[in-house]
Amino acid sequence: MGNPKAFLTIPRKEAGYRPIHDRILDFSEVEQTLNSNDRRQQASRCMDCGVPFCHWACPLGNKAPEWNDALYKGDWELAYRLLNSTNDFPEFTGRICPALCEKACVLNLMDHEPTTNREDECAIVEHAFSEDYVHVEIPERNGKTVAVIGAGPAGLVAANQLNHKGYKVTVFEARENAGGLLRYGIPNFKLNKSIIDRRLRLLEEEGIEFRYNRQIDVTKLPEGFDAYVVSTGTPTARDLKIPGRELKGVYFALELLSQQNRILAGMEFSKDELVTCKGKDVLVIGGGDTGSDCIGTAHRQGCKSVTQIEIMPKPVEGPEDPKNPWPNWPRTLKTTSSHEEGCTRRWNINSLEFLGKNGKLTGVKVQPIDWKPNPEGGRPLMVEAGEPEIIKAEAVFLAMGFLKPQQPEFAENVFVAGDAASGASLVVRAMASGRKIAAQVDKFLNK
């Protein structure tokens, strides 16, 4: 390593976010960037670990020590080549990955100041695009064809990998554009959609064909292809079937997030179709990242207030989780940029009933609860803790995850990738699955 003692003298420095009073007025990306000198200094903190646990923790097996060292030495092109050797689209993970690698960093064990791998990754790939290190590479064709059903992260990675192996790849997408949850679920303030469009232009120039607005029944796959990759994600959100569910004002989280992203892309919706938080008391049910995205979107739409409730207990505060120690992912309290913008957060809250008047939502009846050990083992028991109460709300967003799809029995030339195989997970895991499945397809077609 270029500077094996840098971690002893250089503290961790994050780029941070734009000021709250500025960022809530638009949907531009909230995260800022460091200058190149500061970025190289941060890369120098990556120590010459005997065992690089960052590599172990990353589903893609990213070579963080190698590209951090190249970045520190100022060899941005080598850093990009090393990064791109394991990660097809680092411009996505560099923005939205939770950075499993950083939690597994040896420096995180020592002083809770791990290397800034995610930010370094984003800086490397953006520098690569600006300096034209990212080239169109049209491979020699091998005469075989592959259909990819679904243009989310897993499908795009599989298509990219197979295209570079010489296959003629056609991607079928049910919606009007590619990206899956990258485009229709993740807000622009975390991932500007121009970043996706830039990559799609490159994929098209390299020979991948995209067919949009094509809803494909996976039991009736289009004919004429040598192999198929099914990467349709997890389209079914978990519902909350309690009294009052039919009231106007109760929505799935993606109804808000997807529509807002489409509006920013130039689509128009009628007043009756519009899902808006403007001037409303908003309640988000579900404590994960999707719920957090709803909070940030609600602020930008001009909500009156936002409350987020979660049925599970409050996670451990602080950097360590005694029940899930390093180098595993710590199940600790996460405060996002959206939470920083203003939000009442509550845990151990069970929703009982949606309340309304004249068919419109006015509030939610909830019950504070506790979780007690189950004497028979297994899942803890939920018990009431106090009296029911009513949370005022004119808009509720259900952000409770997604149901794992049940796939039919497929022929031997059909492969399932990403969330369609595993159930809802991280974008980085879907991308890793896309690479794995592409290798399996290649092996199958060459046996």
Language-model region placement:
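Iron-sulfur cluster-binding cysteine motifs and their immediate structural context
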Residues: D48-K73, T93-I124, T170, A174-N177, ...
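Ferredoxin-type iron-sulfur electron-transfer modules in oxidoreductases and energy-metabolism complexes
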Residues: I24-Q42, K63-R95, D111-I138
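Glycine-rich phosphate/pyrophosphate-binding beta-alpha loops
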Residues: R45-V51, D88, A421-V427
